[in-house]
Amino acid sequence: MASYPNGQSCPGAAGQVPGVPPGGYYPGPPHGGGQYGSGLPPGGGYGAPAPGGPYGYPSAGGVPSGTPSGPYGGIPPGGPYGQLPPGGPYGTQPGHYGQGGVPPNVDPEAYSWFQSVDADHSGYISLKELKQALVNSNWSSFNDETCLMMINMFDKTKSGRIDVAGFSALWKFLQQWRNLFQQYDRDRSGSISSTELQQALSQMGYNLSPQFTQLLVSRYCARSAIPAMQLDCFIKVCTQLQVLTEAFREKDTAVQGNIRLSFEDFVTMTASRML
């Protein structure tokens, strides 16, 4: 028997937490535009979202109020993943992309970063290239699990790579999660402690025990005297929690807060939703 606390309400279709459709890419919120949706962390969950943007859209300017302007996740002011090379991506050489300009429905800044990250000029971002481009606040590379999860989410062609449209959606997705990470990093340490994660999940609408939160931190954090969660693990945990919550919601057709499953149904539901 699985359950969520009484009093928590299941969101309607407009607030549906995303799964991963057969196409293998992340659709974004249902009201997002474009082939890939908006690529932002979705609205809704089991419980109301916190005021001011978590699991929805941020306050004006794209950054939750009270967040610092300095780098989080190795993302300096003016753009993610370090500075662009002088003279634009690839210096002054024409490169793979020619002079065609930014493709339709692609964020111009994301397009510039796509060109910079696409080291082999193939027109796609591989797992290796993505991992090399992403760093946490302590300058460690994003872990393989999170990078592979994001490749699977935004790889519409199931080729193991992300095209420019998928990267544009991924870029927005990363920016939104970075903003949320900043908001919940109360002590501005550059990492999320067990207490901060508990507060974050609570404000996102999840009524989970401190013991469960501590389990998440111990599972996804590097061993240290004071375990804390870097941005890559924060993205992994919150995204996976959303996906599993949606799987639960689909089974809870009576909106009673509990479901009854056979062991095989449980394993199937979990395996089919793991990113």
UniProtKB/Swiss-Prot annotation:
Biased composition (Low complexity): 59-70
Name of the protein described by the UniProt record: Peflin
Top-rank taxon, per record: Eukaryota
Subunit text: Heterodimer; heterodimerizes (via the EF-hand 5) with PDCD6. Dissociates from PDCD6 in presence of calcium.
Summary of the function given for this chain in its UniProt record: Calcium-binding protein that acts as an adapter that bridges unrelated proteins or stabilizes weak protein-protein complexes in response to calcium. Together with PDCD6, acts as a calcium-dependent adapter for the BCR(KLHL12) complex, a complex involved in endoplasmic reticulum (ER)-Golgi transport by regulating the size of COPII coats.
Gene name of the record: Pef1
Single GO term (MF): identical protein binding
UniProt-listed InterPro entries: EF-hand-dom_pair, EF_Hand_1_Ca_BS, EF_hand_dom, Peflin/Sorcin_CaBP
Chain positions covered by the region annotation 8 X 9 AA approximate tandem repeat of [AP]-P-G-G-P-Y-G-G-P-P: 21-100
Organism of derivation: Mus musculus
Location of region: Disordered: 21-45, 59-103
PANTHER family reported for this sequence: PEFLIN
Main location: cytoplasm
Sequence repeat spans: 21-29, 31-39, 41-49, 50-59, 60-68, 76-84, 85-91, 92-100
GO cellular component, as recorded: COPII vesicle coat; Cul3-RING ubiquitin ligase complex; endoplasmic reticulum
Any single biological process term in GO: neural crest cell development
Protein location: Cytoplasm; Endoplasmic reticulum; Membrane; Cytoplasmic vesicle, COPII-coated vesicle membrane
